[in-house]
Amino acid sequence: MNTLTAVCSRGGNIIACPHGAIGIDQEMIDYLTRPEDTAKHASLLGSMIAFDLHKEFGIPACIYDAIGTDEMQPIARVTGLPEIPRFTVGHTLNTRAMAIKCAEEVLKKPFNECTFIVAHLGGGSSIRLYHKGVNIDCVNDDEGNFSPERGGGCSGKELVKLCFKEFSEGAGEKTVMKKIHGNGGLKAHLGTTDAIEVEKRIEAGDKYAKVVYDAMAYRVAKDIGTLSVPVAGKVDRIILTGGIAYSKYLTSQIAEKVDWIAPVEMMPGEYEMEALAGGALRVLRGEEELQDFAEIKASAVDRIRICEGVEPYTVPEN
């Protein structure tokens, strides 16, 4: 290979951005590297490398389906605490890519004419509802099901008690956050994040490993059922993807609980590199627009506003 036409990277946690391609410029890099504006994530490095290649070779550079992609409908954002609205963050790149692939190869229909529930099952798991091309609702990795590393949703009252207990014993916010987001789920119960090891324990007769692992499948299935409600159960396909979707033990349990909603497609693994290449190619062909970061930042508040005249509790920095 001696010609490079464009470069496309995973996107960092740009708050409330739409799906698709966003051009990388100095303003984006400045935003992504300011700790007060965005959370630390490995994908930040990709954006910086892509921008360096853009400057060196004069080729287009973009991010695609960033982890901060948030297109949730206003009604889905409301919680009982105005200070804590709901938002979307996480596995947009792989879940949207798998939904597009399923639409094209299985249903033979345009993606924006279909409705999918896509469960990304990995170290952290999230579930997305794609309706007519838009991710209108989700279950984030800290809201519902637990996973190998995440604690998932739990009693708010008990969580408050746990936080105060940890603080009284000298722990700080980072320690408590790590307990929930990194050391929760299978790791907390079984001391490992390796699903293969857990299944071997189950085969060897470990009853506790079985009930915890089965509970993880149960919670995923419940969340899939939850996301069928906003579209009145009119779902074209349920897709199980991510690294743990290779587990027939786990996916069979999930499928048997949700296949009454829609047929279940097993699409294990991740399709992220192909998704980045496909996104860049669609931009080069003129099939998708290369969006401007400054415009996205300027309109971010409107995208996460619950109601006209009501300011979001969390306002993106301009």
Description of each model-found segment:
Residues 47-51, 63, 78, 83-115, ...:
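Glycine-rich phosphate-binding loop plus the immediately following alpha-helix
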Residues 235-254:
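Glycine-rich phosphate-binding loops at beta-strand->alpha-helix junctions
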Residues 7-9, 60-66, 117-119, 137-139, ...:
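General beta-strand structural signal in soluble alpha/beta enzymes
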Residues 1-42, 68-77:
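Short beta-strand-loop/turn "lid" adjacent to the catalytic site in phosphate-handling enzymes
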Residues 1-5, 105-109, 223-236:
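Phosphate/pyrophosphate-binding loops at sites that engage ATP/ADP/AMP, CoA/4′-phosphopantetheine
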Residues 172, 178, 182-233:
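Adenine-nucleotide phosphate-binding core of ATP-dependent small-molecule kinases
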Residues 266-318:
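Structural signal for terminal/edge beta-strands and the immediately following C-terminal loop/tail
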